[in-house]
Amino acid sequence: MSLHPVILLVLVLCLGWKINTQEGSLPDITIFPNSSLMISQGTFVTVVCSYSDKHDLYNMVRLEKDGSTFMEKSTEPYKTEDEFEIGPVNETITGHYSCIYSKGITWSERSKTLELKVIKENVIQTPAPGPTSDTSWLKTYSIYIFTVVSVIFLLCLSALLFCFLRHRQKKQGLPNNKRQQQRPEERLNLATNGLEMTPDIVADDRLPEDRWTETWTPVAGDLQEVTYIQLDHHSLTQRAVGAVTSQSTDMAESSTYAAIIRH
């Protein structure tokens, strides 16, 4: 009865040694992300576990984080890699990741660790260099359009300024024309008024002897001696009225005779 536990222990030790021997014989596995190692918060990332040969006999693949199981899934036959999609990521996703797969009850060695970091800012990835296109013609065309638009704008501005100045000159010219038309009429009216006013003024400014001679009436039968003197109407008008235009003085130039009665 005491031999059975001993035999059972020997069998377990042999089985464990066989498993360790098989584990070391499995092919290596690699791990890599399909994007940058710097992951923006809120985005998705895919971790790929790749094998060196087709794992038609493998049945399980596991993704570990910091030595603990993070995700695992069954493998598909005749594939050389499996993918684990993680996201939307946050700060808890930051860590060291590795892959391991099984064949039956045997597990392979872990892959090299992959460090993922989650950042808050959006990571701008530089695009792959592609064929460059010549855009010099586009720059030349833009400069040409800008020049044409600038010239048209300056022409419109000049036309508006010219119309404004022309309109202003017309406004200022109308009152001047009216004044020039009114000045000859005013001069004619002044001359007419001066001629109408001069007889009265001359009569008022006569000397007392002249006024006396006009009121003196000769007696019938008396001898009368009549003497005629010439009076300058221009000097009398200028003394009474003041400044009279040259046109009125030329028209009013005449000789006036007065009769003086002597006894």
Swiss-Prot record:
Cytoplasmic side: 166-263
Keywords assigned by UniProt, alphabetized: Cell membrane, Disulfide bond, Glycoprotein, Immunoglobulin domain, Membrane, Phosphoprotein, Receptor, Signal, Transmembrane, Transmembrane helix
Residue positions of motif ITIM motif 1: 226-231
Membrane disposition: Single-pass type I membrane protein
Tissue specificity as recorded in UniProt: Expressed in lymphoid organs and in cell lines of hemopoietic origin.
Membrane side Extracellular: residue ranges: 22-144
Disulphide-bridged cysteine pairs: 49-99
GO cellular component, one term: plasma membrane
Sugar-bearing residue positions: 34, 90
Signal peptide: 1-21
Subcellular location: Cell membrane
Residue intervals passing through the bilayer: 145-165
GO biological-process terms attached to the record: cell surface receptor signaling pathway
InterPro entries, A to Z: Ig-like_dom (IPR007110), Ig-like_dom_sf (IPR036179), Ig-like_fold (IPR013783), Ig-like_Receptors_ImmuneReg (IPR050412), Immunoglobulin_dom (IPR013151)
Domain Ig-like C2-type: 27-115
Segments carrying motif ITIM motif 2: 255-260
Chain positions found as Phosphotyrosine: 228, 257
Subunit structure and binding partners: Interacts with SH2 domains of tyrosine-protein phosphatases PTPN6 and PTPN11. The interaction with PTPN6 is constitutive. Interacts with the SH2 domain of CSK. Binds with high affinity to extracellular matrix collagens, the interaction is functionally important.
Comment on protein domains: ITIM (immunoreceptor tyrosine-based inhibitor motif) motif is a cytoplasmic motif present in 2 copies in the intracellular part of LAIR1. When phosphorylated, ITIM motif can bind the SH2 domain of several SH2-containing phosphatases, leading to down-regulation of cell activation.
Role played: Functions as an inhibitory receptor that plays a constitutive negative regulatory role on cytolytic function of natural killer (NK) cells, B-cells and T-cells. Activation by Tyr phosphorylation results in recruitment and activation of the phosphatases PTPN6 and PTPN11. It also reduces the increase of intracellular calcium evoked by B-cell receptor ligation. May also play its inhibitory role independently of SH2-containing phosphatases. Modulates cytokine production in CD4+ T-cells, down-regulating IL2 and IFNG production while inducing secretion of transforming growth factor beta.
PANTHER family assigned to the protein according to its UniProt record, in alphabetical order: LEUKOCYTE-ASSOCIATED IMMUNOGLOBULIN-LIKE RECEPTOR 1, MHC CLASS I NK CELL RECEPTOR
Protein name: Leukocyte-associated immunoglobulin-like receptor 1
Source organism of this protein record: Mus musculus (Mouse)
Gene that this sequence comes from: Lair1
